[in-house]
From Swiss-Prot:
GO biological process assignments: activin receptor signaling pathway; cellular response to insulin stimulus; cellular response to starvation; fat cell differentiation; negative regulation of follicle-stimulating hormone secretion; negative regulation of hepatocyte growth factor production; negative regulation of insulin secretion; positive regulation of follicle-stimulating hormone secretion
Start and end residues of each stretch annotated as Disordered: 29-60
Source organism (scientific name): Bos taurus
Full protein name: Inhibin beta B chain
Pfam families from the UniProt entry: TGF_beta, TGFb_propeptide
Transmembrane segments: none
PANTHER family: INHIBIN BETA B CHAIN, TGF-BETA FAMILY
Residues carrying sugar: 94
Record's subcellular location: Secreted
Keywords: Cleavage on pair of basic residues, Disulfide bond, Glycoprotein, Growth factor, Hormone, Secreted, Signal
Chief localisation class: secreted
Amino acid sequence: MDGLPGRALGAACLLMLAVGSLGPGVWGSPTPPPLPAAPQPPPPPPGAPGGSQDTCTSCGGFRRPEELGRVDGDFLEAVKRHILNRLQMRGRPNITHAVPKAAMVTALRKLHAGKVREDGRVEIPHLDGHASPGADGQERVSEIISFAETDGLASSRVRLYFFISNEGNQNLFVVQASLWLYLKLLPYVLEKGGRRKVRVKVYGQEQGPGDRWAAVEKRVDLKRSGWHTFPLTEPIQALFSRGERRLSLDVQCDSCRELAVVPVFVDPGEESHRPFVVVQARLGDSRHRIRKRGLECDGRTNLCCRQQFFIDFRLIGWNDWIIAPTGYYGNYCEGSCPAYLAGVPGSASSFHTAVVNQYRMRGLNPGTVNSCCIPTKLSTMSMLYFDDEYNIVKRDVPNMIVEECGCA
């Protein structure tokens, strides 16, 4: 942590854990719930005027933004790095042009994933910045929505391209995947009560020339215009297994022209009917869970406790790619750690070992290094966001919210 400003040491200390407890660099909520009274400032670090030997040396430089009088740039960057780390992204997506709102709204509605308010904000159940109910300790399922691009060539067979995010993991297991295609009926004379029956064939296309294979074939009886789904679980699982992300599909509709049925592909006048692929995938992740109960900061104790704070994605300029929630309660840990509070097991002790080793490398005596107030329990939060390929990703992100704090 050499070279970091003193006021960023608290955030740097906690970033070594890659968890959700960062210094409260940014907060602010449209309608945040009332928070407990602000706790007393933690004791200054050893060696500083009024310093105490009960203070964790490695975290002693931490100061809250209300003490700094302004939003600190180091804390802001620490918050950003932490979010990207939890999403397994190297940097924020480069959003040069937005996905058409009509296409996004249609996809969300068809999946019953949420609704769009009149002001354009997306409301998703359980995506309110709090912990996801029942998410911890279970297999997490990511939901990825990828919109189609096309080669623009007019023919009975149209090739669609999808760039599907694998969420930074090569061992994703595809639970279910499907192509959503809108079939529009044009005026046509039919017998009373008759239906238009067409056969839609979807072919997968490998990277090599001529490597085409049948993915799915489906007979569709049409009475009105509407959406239809075509299963693609196995082809997309094979795509992920090869470490690839680009999915090429040839779509062919027999008898569509004769029966005045028009599959809607990529048409600027039909953005709300743009084809999309939905992938539900899971990644098993066994994590050691710590159930030690911690204190809430209420202004009446200087001991290690959890302090609430709200990170507003608009204030850090990330509301263009994070669709929901508008922010989240990251929370952080602060307070003193007397000797009798030390000894939290699991990740806490591992973290303490890392801190002690850092001081050994600096030639300091680890016997003088006391316990740190750090997260001992973290929870999962659901997020909906764009990735680099303009996929809409709905994901349960682990270790985002600090639930309890302890000493180690």
